[in-house]
Each structure stands twice: as C-alpha cells, then as structure tokens.
A protein has these predicted regions:
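Transmembrane beta-strands of outer-membrane beta-barrel pores
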Residues: 37-43, 85-87, 96-102, 139-145, ...
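Outer-membrane beta-barrel transmembrane domain signature of Gram-negative proteins
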Residues: 3-91, 126-130
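Transmembrane beta-barrel architecture of outer-membrane proteins
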Residues: 11-17, 72-78, 116-122, 165, ...
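Surface-exposed extracellular loop regions of Gram-negative outer-membrane beta-barrel proteins
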Residues: 72-111, 116-122
Length: 183
C-alpha cells in the first residue's frame, strides 16, 4: 500500500522567569524566591492519501486526516530557605504550581481541560563530619506530565503496521524522591 502523508505543525513556546536571592550573613542563611510561566501552543494538521491501483490515483483517506490543538500553561511560585549551623546545613522549600493541559481535536465538539493545582515541597539536610566526610538526606516531590503526542486522541495511521493513539485524560505522574548520601 502506498500512502502520502502531509503533516503541518506549528509550535509556540513562551517562557518568563524571575528569581530573587537574598543572603543573611549574620545568621549564615539564604532566602530564594521566584516565579515562572511556561506557555505552549501546538497545532497539527495531518492530511493523508492512499494510492488506488484501480484508478492509478491517490485518494484522500478521511480516517487518517485530523486537526489537533494542544495548549499548556504552567504558572509557578517558589520559596527556599537555607542555613548553616556549624557542621549542620539544612534547606527547605516549596513550589506552588497551577497548570492546564488542553489537548483537543479541533473537529471534535468535546473540550478537554486537564486542570491541576499542586504543591511540591523539598527538604535537604547535611552534616559534615570532616572536610572529606559528609552525610546527606533529602526529599523532593516532582511531577512528570504527559506530552502532547501522548494526549492526542486521534489514531495515527502514518504507519499501517503500528497505529498510535493518545489518551487526553492521562493524569500526571507524581514522584516522591528520597536520597541518602555519604561522601
């Protein structure tokens, strides 16, 4: 089977970030704060034709044609406080995040909005036994979001032997990471 596939894609990504750090030398501490914004917009227009041996022409394959839009907005604020007390160092922080993922087939009347509000704490502790020996313990919460292709609800026929279809209702993955180290 011969197939022609025309895929037009447009991607826009806008990122803005501001960070502030303030040292408090009188108590051997540091404060950091900041904000970040990420805006993504993607449009995918796919047109497919299959070769018809009888008519010896390419014929439009309506099953494989689609127009897909993906919008993502992530807004976050963070704050961190760290201090050293003799041989002991600690740091604690929090990131607050509001995010939207909007994966939609433009031809579809169903509008899907994945809307999330999350807190991401972190804590790091270190104790120095000597200049060459240190024990550390840390915790952080992270997020992994599905990408636009994983959320695309249209079945891709670009390869007749391997069909792909995303799930627009996929939820993000949250990871609680603990680390114990000795150097």
């Amino acid at each position: 089977m011969l197939q022609q596939l025309l895929n037009k894609e447009k991607n826009n990504i806008t990122t803005a970030q501001v960070d502030f750090s303030y040292l408090l030398p009188e108590i051997s501490a540091r404060i950091e704060t900041g904000a970040k914004m990420i805006l993504r917009n993607q449009k995918v227009d796919t047109y497919s034709e299959e070769y018809d041996a009888l008519s010896q022409q390419y014929i439009e394959n309506n099953l494989a044609n689609f127009l897909y839009s993906y919008d993502e907005q992530i807004y976050s604020l963070y704050g961190i406080f760290g201090q050293q007390l003799g041989k002991f160092k600690y740091q604690g922080g929090i990131r607050i995040e509001k995010s939207y993922q909007i994966p939609n087939l433009i031809s579809d009347t169903i509008r899907i909005v994945n809307d999330y509000f999350n807190f991401f704490p972190s804590a790091h502790l270190r104790y120095s036994f000597s200049k060459k020996s240190e024990l550390g313990l840390s915790y952080s919460k992270r997020i992994t979001r599905a990408g636009s292709g994983e959320l695309n609800p249209f079945t891709s026929y670009s390869d007749p032997f391997n069909l792909r279809k995303g799930n627009p209702y996929l939820q993000p993955e949250f990871i609680n990471s603990f680390d114990l180290s000795y150097t």
